[in-house]
UniProtKB/Swiss-Prot annotation:
InterPro entries: Ribosomal_uL5, Ribosomal_uL5_bac-type, Ribosomal_uL5_C, Ribosomal_uL5_CS, Ribosomal_uL5_dom_sf, Ribosomal_uL5_N. Belongs to the universal ribosomal protein uL5 family. Keywords: Ribonucleoprotein, Ribosomal protein, RNA-binding, rRNA-binding, tRNA-binding. It holds the Pfam family Ribosomal_L5_C. It comes from the Bacteria. GO terms for biological process: translation. This is Large ribosomal subunit protein uL5. GO terms for molecular function: rRNA binding; structural constituent of ribosome; tRNA binding. GO terms for cellular component: ribonucleoprotein complex; ribosome. Part of the 50S ribosomal subunit; part of the 5S rRNA/L5/L18/L25 subcomplex. Contacts the 5S rRNA and the P site tRNA. Forms a bridge to the 30S subunit in the 70S ribosome.
């Protein structure tokens, strides 16, 4: 069992149970999945760029991503229907908790001029979205071996019914919010 998974069962769940006055442990919000998405628009011109992005995502997530394709043609971006334009990976279970642990304890402190993450990434239904500008904040990525700096979107899906519950859950997991 991952370190954060044990921490959730032993500390976070009982604390949230008391804080929000739930009747059952099953009502306590929990993280169901984490989705990493990397849009690589430059892949239209060069297929190797997408291969590098997929390689970076494998190192970061620990599992092979699925290549996302364009849903419709857009002439302004020189994109045709079905062109590969990005990659995404969905983490659940132990891999999800291990990634979350690395994100909070190792990767976030490595962000340049980091003062905490903003609280505006909540969607109103208890999910949180976070943008990362550079993939080199993860220790698995070696700076000398990357071809370009790429950002990604990290989407944390929870069972929380409101943003307040989701924020309390993420704060309990030691997410460094600004205020």
């Amino acid at each position: 069992m991952a370190r954060l998974q044990e921490f959730y069962k032993e500390t976070v769940a009982p604390d949230l149970l008391k804080q929000f006055g739930y009747k059952s442990v099953m009502e306590v919000p929990r993280i169901t999945k984490i989705t990493l998405n990397m849009g690589v628009g430059e892949a239209v011109g060069d297929k190797k760029i997408l291969e590098h992005a997929v390689g970076d995502m494998v190192k970061i997530a620990g599992q092979k991503p699925v290549v996302t394709k364009a849903r419709k043609s857009i002439a302004g971006f020189k994109i045709r229907d079905g062109y590969p334009i990005g990659c995404m990976v969905t983490l659940r279970g132990a891999k999800m908790f291990e990634f979350l642990d690395r994100l909070v304890t190792v990767a976030m402190p490595r962000i340049r001029d980091f003062r905490g993450i903003g609280g505006k990434g909540f969607d109103g239904r208890g999910n949180y979205n976070l943008g990362v500008k550079e993939q080199i904040i993860f220790p698995e990525i070696e700076y000398d071996k990357i071809d370009a700096l790429r950002g990604m979107n990290i989407s944390i899906t929870t069972t929380a019914k409101s943003d307040q519950e989701a924020r309390a859950l993420l704060v309990a997991f030691k997410f460094p919010f600004k205020n």
